[in-house]
Amino acid sequence: MATVTAPMNMWSVRIVNGIFVLSNKKPLNLPAHLSQLNIPYSVHFIVDSLASFGLLSSLFSLDQVKQSCALLVQHKPNDQCTVLPTCVLDLEFDITVYVRSRQRVLQPGALQLALIFIKPVNGSEMAWDVRDPPETMVGQRLYENVSQGTVKALETPDHLLLTGEAIGRSDGTYDMLFKDQKIPCMVNYSNVFASYHSPNEEILPRALEITMLGQKTARLTFRPGHECPSATVSFRAEVRPILQPKVLFSHFLNWIRVNYDCQVMPLYPEQEEVVNAHDWVRFQVNNKFLVSTAVDTPLKVFICGLGQPSFLVADPGIWNPSSTCLLTLHNISNQPVKLRTCEPVAVGLLLYCNDAHLPSRDVCFCSETGRLEWRNCVVDSSQIFSWPHATQAKSLDSPKSMDS
């Protein structure tokens, strides 16, 4: 596998206009055109070592940061190498980035990373479609062993609690029926939970949809987040109607929580497939979304990789409203790797943006202008966190506490 672990004395970390920037201080040898680079810093370590915030104990005390995800991207355009954007899933783990390089040796300062905190659109502002009844029952799955769940009104007005025992089907899905007069046509899900009966093990439903079978009857179908041997699964979810959502998805993906209070969309392969060594694969994500005409600034889903060690690396992309999501993965290892439908391979960030004047194939952030350019788009800078009292560049060659 093309992996490099760069020691701590290899890096310079500094603050530039309120943004953390990492750069290599010494020549860096890369074993392949696309390499995994492990950096012995965690996001928490960088933040706590570089800045203090007056009476605040940490940058992570700020709500705006808690509601943001840590994103690692290329700092400024670079002819020698390109950093593939990754979302940091765990702020306590050492940083992992993926570098595409035209040269095997990067000279000091050639590799520059920007660590930014960016706030995607909150899940409370979006909804998921409840599909209309089919015009005909031809092709619909009908079973003798049907499980009927319960619908309970919660104290909060119009909030419903769906519970029951879902039955497993041959295609790996689980489903159950609900009967109620108050099932809305657009819903927001929260506290989605499922578990085995024996052993009592939680599973994370990774995809879920509700289809009306009549005026009062609905079928809820979901796929578990990992292989589930049980014939039945306990299911629970809270739903509430949304009349005017900013974004409407065709079906629900159980979003991943990162940082303290930020959610990103996991993207899964639709089918299992083997990717040969140093090969790539492209597949389609079976989901679509619409954006309300009341939203003035364009909203798109920006696709980035997972900030964790992996044989599979996702190319950055942009998923546009009403279009299909296409995802490209590269196997950077020396052996075949199997795609598994229960394991996310990338994440999507729902962000406001505008068209770029000079479209590019790459993704980079410029600390001087505060612009995050993502291929043919510029991400709205209001979603990127910076702090005005830390505008002077501060270098940190050997990590230690520094005051702003």
UniProtKB/Swiss-Prot annotation:
It comes from the Viruses. It holds the Pfam family Herpes_ORF11. InterPro entries: Herpes_Orf11. This is Uncharacterized gene 10 protein. It comes from Alcelaphine herpesvirus 1 (strain C500) (AlHV-1). The gene is 10.
